[in-house]
Swiss-Prot record:
Gene Ontology cellular component annotations, sorted alphabetically: plasma membrane-derived thylakoid lumen
Stated role: Functions as an electron carrier between membrane-bound cytochrome b6-f and photosystem I in oxygenic photosynthesis.
GO biological process: photosynthesis
Gene source species: Synechocystis sp. (strain ATCC 27184 / PCC 6803 / Kazusa)
UniProt KW Signal keyword: yes
Name used for this protein in its record: Cytochrome c6
Family from the record: Belongs to the cytochrome c family. PetJ subfamily.
Length: 120
C-alpha cells in the first residue's frame, strides 16, 4: 500500500503538478494580454474616436451610439463588425484604414465592445 501511494505521489508531484502550474501560468498571461489590449484600445480610442464618440455616444448621429442596443440593432456587436466599421467608415464616419494599424483597430474594437457590455 505504501509503495503504491509513494509511486502515485511521484507521478503527481513529478508530472501532474508541474503541468498544472504551467497551465495556470499560461492562462494568467492570457488575461494580462487581454487587459493590455483593452488599455491600448482605450488610448487609441481617446486619441482618434472620443471627439465624436465620447462615453459611447455619437455627436454626429445620436441614434447610432456605441451602446450595446444600438450596436446590436446595426449589426455592429462583434469585434469583426466594429473593425470593419473602423476600417471602412460609413456615412459621416471616416475610415481609418492606413491611419491606424490593424492591431490598433482590433484593440479599439475590443475596447468598444467591452465598454458596451459594461454599459459605458
Amino acid at each position: 500500500m505504501f509503495k503504491l501511494f509513494n509511486q502515485a505521489s511521484r507521478i503527481f508531484f513529478g508530472i501532474a503538478l508541474p503541468c498544472l502550474i504551467f497551465l495556470g501560468g499560461i492562462f494568467s498571461l492570457g488575461n494580462t494580454a487581454l487587459a493590455a489590449d483593452l488599455a491600448h484600445g482605450k488610448a487609441i480610442f481617446a486619441g482618434n474616436c472620443a471627439a465624436c464618440h465620447n462615453g459611447g455616444l455619437n455627436a454626429i448621429n445620436p441614434s447610432k451610439t456605441l451602446k450595446m442596443a444600438d450596436l446590436e440593432a446595426n449589426g455592429k456587436n462583434s469585434v469583426a463588425a466594429i473593425v470593419a466599421q473602423i476600417t471602412n467608415g460609413n456615412g459621416a464616419m471616416p475610415g481609418f484604414k492606413g491611419r491606424i494599424s490593424d492591431s490598433d483597430m482590433e484593440d479599439v474594437a475590443a475596447y468598444v465592445l467591452d465598454q458596451a457590455e459594461k454599459g459605458w
